[in-house]
Amino acid sequence: YFSNGEKRDITSMEFSISNFSAKPDAGVFSGDLHVSNFLEPDINVKLVSNFKLEFLAKFLNIEDIEDLAGDVELTMNFHDIIDIEHPEKSIEKLNESYFTELKVTNLSFQVPEYHLALKDLDVYAVMDGHAANIDYFDVKIGNSDLHISGTVDDLPAIIHHTSKDVLTHLEISSNYLDLLELTSPSKDSIEGINEALSNMSLGLSFKSSAKDFTESPNLPIGEFFIDDFQAILKHYPHNLHDFHADLIIEEDNMKLVDFTGMVDKSDFHFDGKFTHYEMWLQERPQGDTKIDFNFSSKMIQLEDIFTYGGENFVPEEYRHEEFDDLIVHGFAAMHFKEKLYSTDVTIDLFEAKMKVHHLRFEDFGGRFHLENDDLLIEDFRGTMGRSKFLVNAELGFGTDTLLKTQDNHISLIASKLDFDQ
């Protein structure tokens, strides 16, 4: 219907279409439209659609996706007020009262460039006002399955590419993730990551603006959290659990505030500052990057950490050793000349006590410099029980004798070495 309203001018005009619908071969479309105040239009729209993707693929002649099938149901209600003289203001307030419901059922397709088909994709997501909620996003790829749910507290801020911080939270889980199958370049290849995860769960949170996320020259700028991570690995026969992390990323620097977790019964705590991390991402880096780090653990069982693929990499007499009250502090500097040219690592604190051998590491530290396949060990010191030592060394690891720049040299100074202990 159409009415010019009580005032009989454009401010009171109303226009409405109710229950309009269409049934093309692709599916069913219906909706309602109501517009009032033609000077500053107040628009209410409801759209409901249910269509089949295989028809759309044929109709649009989509060649990059094969065997596309599935159903999509989309419901949209939105209310917007448009200022004709200042339309940019209405864009700023778009979706003040907005509702969208998306349901995808049994979506499947094959990308010619990838050897695995995506199948059984089911999605249910709702956007109400500014907040978006993903009830479920379930998919199967090859032997792997993935389930995602989550929330975005201000989706329009992302759509409009604003500088406002948006908080996103995701819960990701999987019964089985076959990383080798997923990362291999072809069906018969074994060039991918040879690992598989089972009973995996991961909680992630991000606090970043859409602008910082997409326009950062390096990694997305913002604060990122691992709320929880647990998994069982196929070739690393240990239970990873209670992982948590807080990472702050700036344009050129990043700060790992706290990274904690457990491997079976072993725990770890790590924090650090990374300056000019962008060097690691450049194809031909030039310059220096630095790391300052702390590592600590109440208990580390060596057999928990250094066993992989059925092989134990710890000497037999130390396989059941346990390090208690471990504390490490150090810093590293890496110099790049189109590639990594040299690495300098200094450990100024290393303390721990061994449970089986009844020894304590005290006052351990030193400097290690690696350059051109040459390793320089400078003032590496330590005290273990009644033994106290100081080591300096120059070692060459290059295989080309013509490029060898120095003879190997090791210096050991000890006030006492108690081999019995």
State each model region's role:
Residues 1-40, 48-58, 73-83, 97-157, ...:
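Hydrophobic lipid-interacting interfaces of membrane-associated proteins
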Residues 60-64, 109, 188-192, 230-231, ...:
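Extracellular loop and loop/strand-boundary signature of outer-membrane beta-barrel proteins
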Residues 41, 70, 96, 164-166, ...:
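A short, structural micro-pattern
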Residues 93-100, 166, 217-222, 341-343, ...:
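Short flexible loop/turn segments that cap and initiate beta-strands
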Residues 95, 165-167, 217-218, 241, ...:
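Short "repeat-start/strand-capping" segments in structured domains, especially the N-termini
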Residues 7-8, 85-93, 159-163, 213-217, ...:
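Short loop/turn motifs that connect adjacent beta-strands in outer-membrane beta-barrel proteins
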